[in-house]
Amino acid sequence: MRIILLGAPGAGKGTQAQYLMDKYGIPQISTGDMLRAAIKEGTPLGLEAKKVMDAGQLISDDIIIGLVKERITKADCENGFLLDGFPRTIPQADAMKENGVVVDHVIEFDVADEVIVERMGGRRVHPGSGRVYHVVYNPPKVADKDNETGEELIIRADDTEETVRKRLGIYHEQTMPLVDYYQAEAAAGNTQYHKLDGTQAVDAISKQLGELLG
C-alpha cells in the first residue's frame, strides 16, 4: 500500500495520515525527517545534503529522490509507505517515476481556500502547554483564554491570514499541477486516484478512506 497524499496546507492530511499509518501499519515518509536521519547517520547522501545546506543552498531533487529510494528499502516499508509533502512539483513526480518508485494510490483532499483560511486563521494556541483551540470548532470557555490556566491564547505566525494565503498561493502554483499529473497517470492505469471532500467530519473521511483502500 504505497500512498501519496495531496492537498493544501490545512486540508487535514496530517490527521488522516495518522489514521492510515495505524490502519495499514505503514510509515509516513517525510523528506525533512529523512534528511535529518541521513545527516545524523553520515550516509553518502546525508553528507552531500549537509554540504549543500551548510552552503545555504536548496537540496536538489536528485538528492531527495535518492533519499526516498534509500528509505523505502528499509524493513518498515515492506507493506508500503505514505508520502505527505512529496512530491511537490512535476519534476519531482517525474523523477520518482523514472527511478521506479511506484505508487498505488494518490489521495487528494479537496478544500476551498476560504475554508482553509477560516480553519487556520481561527486557531488559538496556549504557548505554555501547546493546547490548541479554534474560535468556531473548539472554542475556549472564555474567549482568548486557556481553559486550564486562564492565560492569554495567541495566534501563531503561521496561522495569520496573510501567511496562510501566501502558502496557498505557493501550493496552487507548484503542487496543484500534480492533481492533473496523477489523474493522467490513473487514466493510463499506473495508479489509482481518489478525490475526497476534505470539509467532511474527520471520522467520515477516515471511513471513506478505509472503504476506498480496502
Curated annotation (Swiss-Prot):
Pathway: Purine metabolism; AMP biosynthesis via salvage pathway; AMP from ADP: step 1/1. AMP binds at T31, R36, Q57, L58, I59, G85, F86, P87, R88, Q92, R156, R167. Its EC number is 2.7.4.3. Residues 122-159 are annotated as: LID. ATP binds at G10, A11, G12, K13, G14, T15, R123, V132, Y133, Q200. GO terms for cellular component: cytoplasm. It catalyses: AMP + ATP = 2 ADP. Signal peptide: none annotated. InterPro entries: Adenyl_kin_sub, Adenylat/UMP-CMP_kin, Adenylat_kinase_CS, Adenylate_kinase_lid-dom, P-loop_NTPase. Gene3D superfamilies: P-loop containing nucleotide triphosphate hydrolases. CDD domains: ADK. Its main location: cytoplasm. It is found in: Cytoplasm. GO terms for molecular function: adenylate kinase activity; ATP binding. Residues 30-59 are annotated as: NMP. Consists of three domains, a large central CORE domain and two small peripheral domains, NMPbind and LID, which undergo movements during catalysis. The LID domain closes over the site of phosphoryl transfer upon ATP binding. Assembling and dissambling the active center during each catalytic cycle provides an effective means to prevent ATP hydrolysis. NCBIfam families: adk (TIGR01351), PRK00279.1-1 (NF001379), PRK00279.1-2 (NF001380), PRK00279.1-3 (NF001381). Catalyzes the reversible transfer of the terminal phosphate group between ATP and AMP. Plays an important role in cellular energy homeostasis and in adenine nucleotide metabolism. Belongs to the adenylate kinase family. This is Adenylate kinase. It comes from Pseudoalteromonas translucida (strain TAC 125).
